Amino acid sequence: GITWAAGGAILLAAWGWVITTKDKHQVNLIDRAEEKIVFGLNKAKGNTVFRGGALAPTKKASQRLVLPGILIGCKVSEYVDSWNRSFALVEHPNNTAAVVIRLTPAGSNLVDQETVDIQVAYWGQWIGDLSNESGITGASITIESLPDPGGRLNREVTSRRAANCPQVAGEVIEGVLDESTGSNQVRVWVTLAFNLAALGGRKNKEIAGREIASRLPGLTQGLVAAGGGATHLVTVNELARLVRSAYDPDSEELFDQALAAGQTINLDWPQSGPVFAQADFSSYRHDGAVSRVWTMTCPPRGAVQSAVLSRLLEPNRDVQRKRVTILYQPMDAAKAPSVVERDLNHARANAVGARPSARSINELAAASEVASEEASGAGLVDFAMIITATTTPDHLEDTSVTVNALSAASRLLIRPAYGAQDSGFALGLPLGLHPVNASVKARP
């Protein structure tokens, strides 16, 4: 009996050690084992490999290139808002829909700090007000940096250049075009996710579509005040090109060349998916490229300045294509007080002691301020971050080192989405998917 009791005590102690021992990402051995087991089961079932178009393993092969994984089943329709602007409405199988808005922010260069502070305040207010918007379940902002083929600048200059311009002016223009070769471009989108049932669209989605269309002018005006620049509602054709170039980066240059030649690109939504995609445990291969996805496990701590993410968001010559998506989800007003109170009590417990650290004192002050603002009527918003880097297989590890360094410079703690690279890739696209409502309905 004593031997069995001693053995049981040892097993309990070992089990407690396994559960309580966590790494810097707060992941224990059980969590890591679960990641590998779940991924292994999906791989054995063939769920980690996707083939589209004529290569699709279906009874009737087709030329359709549907989206893989958790994006299967999403549909796109086009509506017109109150300002007569066409926009794409992305409908997901879980009765949610999303609108994608293209922004043109000017950046922080040559902008005084007072203006930056005002824009940050407006952005915070815009995000906070989403909790008061009926039917909005979440929002996201996506910042993508990628090589610029140069066609956009060439088209803009050519269309504005006078035929009889002076020789000196012509040489300056040609110099600008030459210098743009090999440069980068930055694209920004904001995506709004809606609950169609809350907008009266469970049975009739046209009603929900018209309701969304009537509210877009006010929502986009708030983005302009927050420094978003001119706003543009993304159309179906533009959204299809956006998704297609994410899965097949080489198509970006083909689209640019077609536009430079004055051709019209007619890419339908069923043609926006990849021909081939394969999810590995720590990477995602798709149409000749490979991506790695990270998720944020700890946000910047302490005082957070407006430029804290600048190193991560700006283009980097060592990362061919980088996409950073911040997901926002308004918290239920009935749940917010208890969450704030719990955080405040936790901060107080950490600050109690003979010699509390400076960090714990600052965290207590921040928690107290949040509690005061929430009591005054401010809304709370949960947020997460997904980072996607796309490159060639030979440069994947070097790119990963650079992304980790950029994240550390931005005071972020990130971890690869082990066993969920394909889902992380889809969540990082500006299509309105959020982790709490994303699910796989079917596979082709």
What are these regions (language model features)?
Residues 4-444:
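Extended, folded cores of ATP/NTP-driven motor/assembly subunits in large transport
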